[in-house]
Amino acid sequence: MLYAIVETAGRQYRVEEGKILYTEKQKDYSPGDEIVFDRVVFVRKDGEVLVGKPYVEGAKVVGKVLEHAKARKVKTVKYRPRKNSKVEKGHRQWYTAIKIEKIEL
């Protein structure tokens, strides 16, 4: 089993070949572009473990940007008792879907 942990946008994600990664919106890339993650923190390949200090040298993860979209709406309610007042707000966060094509060592 081959998987890696990559760091992007201040977060770490576990990725495997062929899977789809949902991450914060990557503004610099358009759908169809190739994206390369060179900040690989950890790699596991057939029982062999590589841990970076802080990153694994020579390792990179290559993916393809599928789409930019918005996530489901998160609703918040602020209610003030005895004031006959409440405020409802909603927020939809942008994300980028990336198909992981290969993990290179």
Curated annotation (Swiss-Prot):
Stored PROSITE patterns: RIBOSOMAL_L21 (PS01169)
Keyword Lipoprotein in record: no
Keyword NAD appears in the UniProt entry: no
Entries under InterPro entries matching the protein: bL21-like, bL21-like_sf, Ribosomal_bL21, Ribosomal_bL21_CS
GO molecular function: rRNA binding; structural constituent of ribosome
Source domain of life: Bacteria
Any one GO biological process: translation
Entry similarity comment: Belongs to the bacterial ribosomal protein bL21 family.
NCBIfam families linked to this entry: L21
Job description of the protein: This protein binds to 23S rRNA in the presence of protein L20.
Subunit structure: Part of the 50S ribosomal subunit. Contacts protein L20.
Name used for this protein in its record: Large ribosomal subunit protein bL21
Gene: rplU
